[in-house]
UniProtKB/Swiss-Prot annotation:
It comes from the Bacteria. Residues 1-26 form the signal peptide. This is Uncharacterized protein TP_0447. Gene3D superfamilies: Tetratricopeptide repeat domain (1.25.40.10). Keywords: Signal. InterPro entries: TPR-like_helical_dom_sf (IPR011990).
């Protein structure tokens, strides 16, 4: 058993010792009030960034165990309160239950409800005690902790175990504090599938991201907007008209479009590669355009050459473009245009990259590819 698994087991045993039985360390109420699962998870993230994976596992496991115990404690408090309300003939409504608890001075139950009502008003549960209790039980899941645990195991090459944690996080995604974090989970599952050489699974996860993008239809391959985009590209000998007309500001989906493009190019599936490449290129240019609008108050899109020059003059934007594969995305776009017989448009894309791309290596590649088309 390697060091990571030993640390993982130690984390489980530590969590069980600290939180496993009522009153072992201190009273139940004191214990659940005295520590915060989110604080523990933040520490787990800190030590993870230091690559102290054993401590990461211990903190994340403790956070997950404490989250579960806190919810179980809250459920017990509310179940006891509901039982007393039923015996007093009070209807099963949150408003009636809360009024009874207030009148009786049952502070523990009131504190539980007050904490819930800070973020979820009674109408969210249709004023039903039963629905609130079901929601509370579901909230025992801690998908953020599962995601971090998966990252640790992935980093240590324990891919099967990492994937299980990612799937746990995905199954409980409804409990995410930041809903968009579901995309982090999907991308994590896709990456582990790649590492496990499970390309069909990887494609499935990436298409899951695209399923939330109205411009892409996995069933039809080409949606109406995509058809219009391709018509625009074909209608001119340059790609300028396309980039002036269309903006798609879905940066969260950029990685999925990029990776699917690479997958389909690798298998020479041009019909599948082109639509995802078109949208990847459009998202990339739209993102650069948005960043420039925020930094340069008088900026308006003129053409690709101007966009690339301005991008190169802003280190933060250039860094983002480099880190998010923008230049490779645009090269793939040009490559696929050429393979589809749109030679003039491909040359125009190569030329703009060769002349004005602020990343020298990609400018050099574009110049070489352009020379092959002449």
């Amino acid at each position: 058993m390697n060091n990571l698994i030993k640390a993982y087991a130690a984390g489980v045993m530590s969590a069980a010792f600290l939180f496993g039985s009522e009153g072992r360390v201190r009273s139940e109420s004191d214990r659940v009030r005295g520590e915060d699962p989110w604080h523990l998870l933040q520490w787990a993230q800190v030590v993870y960034e230091r690559e102290e994976f054993g401590d990461t596992l211990r903190y994340a496991q403790r956070a997950r165990a404490l989250r579960r115990e806190q919810v179980e404690h809250q459920c017990r408090v509310l179940l006891r309160a509901r039982t007393r309300a039923e015996s007093a003939g009070i209807p099963e409504t949150l408003s009636d239950l809360y009024a009874l608890l207030k009148s009786r001075g049952e502070t523990d139950a009131c504190e539980v409800l007050d904490a819930i009502f800070l973020t979820h008003a009674p109408h969210v549960f249709q004023n039903s005690v039963s629905k609130l209790l079901q929601w509370l039980k579901d909230s025992a899941a801690f998908p953020e902790a599962e995601l971090l645990l998966g990252k640790v195991f992935e980093g240590e090459g324990e891919y099967a175990q990492a994937l299980q944690h990612y799937r746990n996080a995905w199954d409980t995604r409804a409990q995410l504090v930041v809903p968009d974090a579901r995309f982090d989970i999907i991308y994590a599952m896709a990456n582990v599938s790649r590492l496990l050489s499970q390309q069909d699974e990887r494609e499935k996860y990436l298409l899951l991201v695209l399923s939330e993008d109205p411009l892409y239809s996995a069933r039809e391959v080409w949606g109406k907007t995509l058809h219009a985009m391709l018509r625009t590209i074909r209608s001119s000998n340059t790609v300028e008209k396309f980039f002036k007309l269309y903006r798609h500001r879905n940066v969260l989906a950029l990685r999925a479009y990029q990776e699917l493009t690479e997958m389909y190019v690798r298998t020479d599936n041009i019909e599948r590669a082109l639509p995802v490449s078109v949208l990847a290129a459009d998202i990339a240019i739209s993102a650069l355009d948005s960043f420039l609008q925020k930094i340069e108050l008088t900026y308006q899109y003129k053409d690709l050459a101007d966009l690339f020059l301005r991008t190169g003059s802003h280190p933060t934007i250039l860094k983002w473009a480099n880190e998010h594969g923008v230049w490779q995305t645009l090269l793939h776009f040009a490559d696929l245009l050429y393979k589809k017989g749109l030679h003039a448009q491909a040359r125009d894309m190569y030329y703009n990259l060769a002349e004005k791309c602020p990343a020298f290596e990609y400018a050099r590649r574009a110049a070489y590819k352009l020379s092959l088309t002449l």
